[in-house]
């Protein structure tokens, strides 16, 4: 199974998927975190909905001088392009955020293989972190990405153990 993967999380400034205001990214290789990125991003027009500020606590003042996504993409792309990428609720949210934001800035969406810990566990991130005793500062992108990476690591260990047990029982 996958020995290396990137866990990602995006926070948005409003209801538009292309309004990314924070990127959290964790690279895991052989069960060890080898890289982490937490980047505040200025969304288009630095425009926020108040209810989104209430969720993640990021304000227009914090991103007023932050780079826009097209400038930070070169830092992020190597962790995504041709990689195994995991996000919690990735197919409903994070992967769409990435694609729509890249389209907004006229950038190509790279090939990657997506995985979703919500689809694997069928529960929300906060509940899973409590269940598995994983530290979480919910809606802070790096913390969410780190938690997602830990959940995926647990899944991979469980999957590999089940596969090994099936191989052993066939002998």
Label every model-predicted segment.
Residues 1-3, 149-171:
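Acidic two-metal-ion nuclease catalytic site recognized across multiple nuclease folds
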Residues 1-107, 111, 126-139:
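Conserved non-catalytic scaffold segment of RNase H-like nuclease domains
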Residues 8, 115, 143:
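Active-site flanking residues adjacent to catalytic metal/cofactor-binding acidic residues
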Residues 97, 147-150:
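Amphipathic alpha-helical interaction segments
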Residues 112-125:
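Short, flexible loop segments at boundaries between secondary-structure elements
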Residues 119, 130, 150-153:
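Generic alpha-helical structural context detector
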Residues 140-143, 161-162:
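Short, charged, surface-exposed loops that flank catalytic or proteolytic processing sites
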